[in-house]
């Protein structure tokens, strides 16, 4: 039993170091961050409840969307709602978040059920973990801290917003506009 606690303590220290290295801060409630990296395929059932990162992912998605909406509102003061919505969609898209999560090295920390390989064939595992991580930061540190981390350490270091602005995204809308 004591070995279990030591292993858990070592795992917690390693996770704390990894988060400090990637995001520049020491987490408080390490168990939130451990949960953020537990994929549904590796769910643990406690008192009849499946414990995985999906609830944190839900929360992180909402926090990320709010932070990005505010960021874009300030960055583009003369742009209309359609432009802002399209830009937010580009930034928080599954493809974009997967790319950022992979670039950040989150795949190294994700706990998957054995036999699923690096990403277990799950296409959105890195982006889902990124959203869950944002949810964990929010619960651990609050909105303002999370906002700073998102803008400085995620958007600032791993996204080129100006490049995303130039990128054609909504091909269906472009086709409809062209046909009219």
Which sequence ranges carry the predicted segments?
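Double-stranded RNA-binding/processing signature
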Residues: 1-180
């Amino acid at each position: 039993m004591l070995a279990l606690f030591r292993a858990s303590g070592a795992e917690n220290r390693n996770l704390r170091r990894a988060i400090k290295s990637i995001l520049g801060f020491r987490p408080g409630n390490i168990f939130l961050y451990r949960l953020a990296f537990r994929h549904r395929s590796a769910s643990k059932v406690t008192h009849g409840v499946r414990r995985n990162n999906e609830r944190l992912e839900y929360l992180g998605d909402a926090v990320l969307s709010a932070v990005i909406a505010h960021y874009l509102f300030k960055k583009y003061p003369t742009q209309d709602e359609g432009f802002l919505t399209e830009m937010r969609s580009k930034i928080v898209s599954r493809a974009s978040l997967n790319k950022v999560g992979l670039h950040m090295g989150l795949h190294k920390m994700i706990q998957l059920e054995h036999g699923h390989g690096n990403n277990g064939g799950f296409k959105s595992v890195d982006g889902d973990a990124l959203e869950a991580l944002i949810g964990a930061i929010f619960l651990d540190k609050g909105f303002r801290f999370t906002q700073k981390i998102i803008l400085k350490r995620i958007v600032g270091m791993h996204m080129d917003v100006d490049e995303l602005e130039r990128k054609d995204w909504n091909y269906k809308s472009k086709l409809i506009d062209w046909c009219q």
